[in-house]
């Protein structure tokens, strides 16, 4: 793959990654509710989920999703319900220690990682959209597999960098409010963002 083709794809990936969607909303929710460490774990989970999703898309899953309304809706609703459930738990679970630093402060890093890994994998639009843009950068006269690997790695890395920026910004903003009442409301807001992200996934249409 020529450098100018790769660079064009990297820039396209960055523009896509910067647009806030359900994935970014869930990362911000974790940052506001549980702090930087948990937010960064959710970023790692999203990166793994994105990598799996785009790999599946290049392996043919996009064709199934594009032609099967049932498969599309199963992925969509599974991701939506999961995020909404996590958000409601975050809103209702306010009796834990009010701190952004320990595991008791909210979600555990492992649960944030697994949650966003599922969000990445269960987001059907990621699969369909990646196929739409990657097709513009794969040359049929060159071996397919090396090009596909480069695109998957590039997209995942660029999206992870963008998500990290969102996580650090949101967690830093949340730390500006240190009173117990402020932290309670920040956590509720974080849970609300997760619920909103789930609702956003539920409204996706083919």
Residue map of PLM features:
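Hydrophobic alpha-helical transmembrane segments in multi-pass integral membrane proteins
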Residues: 55-58, 122-127, 131, 194-206
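Short, conserved phosphate/pyrophosphate- and ester-handling motifs at nucleotide-, phospho-/glycolipid
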Residues: 21, 123, 191
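Hydrophobic/aromatic residues within the transmembrane alpha-helices of Major Facilitator Superfamily
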Residues: 14, 18, 51-52, 88, ...
């Amino acid at each position: 793959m020529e450098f100018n083709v790769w660079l064009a794809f990297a820039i396209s990936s960055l523009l896509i990654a910067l647009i806030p969607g359900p994935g970014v909303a869930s990362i911000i929710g974790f940052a506001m509710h549980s702090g930087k460490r948990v937010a960064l774990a959710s970023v790692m989970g999203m990166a793994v989920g994105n990598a799996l999703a785009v790999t599946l898309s290049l392996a043919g899953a996009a064709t199934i999703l594009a032609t099967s309304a049932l498969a599309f809706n199963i992925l969509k609703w599974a991701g939506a319900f999961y995020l909404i459930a996590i958000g409601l738990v975050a809103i209702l679970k306010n009796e834990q220690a009010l701190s952004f630093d320990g595991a008791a402060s909210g979600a555990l890093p492992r649960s944030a990682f697994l949650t966003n890994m599922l969000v990445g994998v269960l987001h059907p639009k990621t699969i369909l959209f990646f196929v739409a843009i990657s097709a513009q950068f794969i040359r049929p006269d060159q071996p397919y597999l090396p090009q596909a690997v480069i695109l998957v790695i590039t997209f995942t890395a660029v999206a992870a960098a963008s998500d990290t920026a969102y996580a650090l910004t949101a967690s830093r903003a949340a730390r500006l409010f240190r009173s117990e009442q402020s932290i309670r409301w920040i956590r509720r807001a974080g849970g609300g963002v997760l619920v909103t992200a789930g609702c956003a996934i539920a409204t996706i249409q083919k």
